[in-house]
């Protein structure tokens, strides 16, 4: 949903995924490369998934690390923390106008995001207002995910249903 939140709806997606047994009963979608085009403007994205079982990652959860990089015409924004803290960097880094700014003063624990999301949803119901992620956007995020899975299985580009 961060992809849609930052850059808007996705038009089409292409995924290259190696599916193999991981352990006794689960399948892994790693390694993988997923690319997509947003519906508005010249906005493209990619998501690389790599299995690195021997890589030490600081985390209070599971040994995975995710981050987001958004490159625009005037700068780059990095969100360096989701479930892990591989880089030990500020959670938000902005490179713009020849300067790099690091933003540290924020709650970044992965578990806190679920608590804040649940509180936001409850307040929206009680207060009668729309939460940040509405039903239409949630359905689009699901459609994007399903299209990526279909693309990986069928080995072709897939349009994301509106």
Short names for language-model regions:
Residues 68, 84-99:
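Short polybasic amphipathic segments
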Residues 109-111, 136:
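A short, ordered amphipathic alpha-helix with a cationic face
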Residues 1-84, 111, 115-127, 161:
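Contiguous beta-strand/loop segments that form the cofactor/metal-binding neighborhood of enzyme cores
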Residues 120-162:
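C-terminal helix-rich "cap/oligomerization" subdomain common to oxidoreductases
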Residues 25-26, 91, 145-146:
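Short secondary-structure transition/capping segments
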């Amino acid at each position: 949903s961060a992809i849609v939140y930052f850059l808007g709806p996705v038009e089409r997606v292409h995924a290259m995924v190696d599916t193999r047994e991981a352990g006794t009963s689960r399948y892994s979608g790693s390694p993988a490369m997923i690319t997509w085009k947003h519906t508005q403007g010249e906005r493209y994205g990619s998501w690389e998934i790599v299995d690195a079982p021997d890589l030490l990652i600081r985390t209070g959860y599971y040994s995975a690390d995710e981050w987001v990089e958004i490159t625009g015409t005037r700068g780059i924004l990095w969100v360096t923390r989701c479930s892990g803290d591989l880089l030990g960097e500020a959670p938000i880094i902005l490179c713009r106008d020849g300067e790099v700014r690091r933003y540290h003063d924020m709650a970044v624990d992965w578990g806190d995001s679920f608590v804040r999301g649940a509180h936001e949803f409850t307040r929206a119901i009680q207060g009668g207002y729309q939460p940040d992620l509405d039903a239409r956007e949630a359905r689009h995020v699901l459609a994007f995910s399903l299209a990526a899975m279909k693309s990986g299985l069928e080995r072709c580009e897939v349009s994301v249903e509106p």
